[in-house]
Amino acid sequence: WAVFAILVLGTALGIRLAYDRDSYEILAYDDLIRHERYQEVIRRAEKYQPPTPISACSVNFSLFMNGQLPARMPEFYQCGTQGLVLPSIRDNVSDLTSAELLWMMGMPNITLQYYFDSMESIENGRLSGRFLSRMADCNLVNGWYGPAEKYLDLLSHSLFYRKSALRRKEMVRNEAAVDADPVYAYVRSVRFRDDFITGYDHLDLMMSILYNQNSSNFMAAEYFNAWQRLKQMEGMR
């Protein structure tokens, strides 16, 4: 019995040591955000939040989606402006929340770059349906129908994305159909009017431009204000 007890205790301890809570939480945040369950991200962070930029980015995005970013940002872990939008990191997790919020804010070109980098980081060289799907969206919004069609052709042969891909293939080279889609129409209405990509260091300037060209882009305004606030906090340290 003593040997058995030691084995049980050792197994339990090994499982506990192997459990990386921070990584688990970050993956949980990603899954919840993917399914638009932002309040659950906040609830988890209220109990425990990993002290990492990826975590801060996910929680801040969830706060914004619940209309709580300005009021509640100080309650959670912050790490400067990287906690709002991460610079592109070539792995298959770090860029995802940043890419999604930049898509919603009206920066499909940078979103496309982030997802391309994420795809390139997959070690076995396989394609991700999730990444391809958003890359197709970015190309449709921009009117770049050749690449969009290529990505949608690939997705049309997949199990989980086939139906959506076939629906979107009908929009290729059909401006009226793209404009009739509420998500695409919104992103088109708030995106940059001029086609350019700039560096991470100028993201706050890009947010300002987005808001000035379309004052209904509340997300750009709120993220710009939060960016300046965090820069001031960094300067005081």
Q: Which positions does each model-derived feature cover?
A:
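Short, intrinsically disordered, charge-balanced linker/junction segments flanking boundaries
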Residues: 236-237
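Soluble catalytic regions of membrane-associated enzymes that act on cell-envelope
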Residues: 15-190, 196, 212-233
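Outer-membrane pore/translocation modules
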Residues: 191-208
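Internal/C-terminal transmembrane anchor helices
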Residues: 2-20
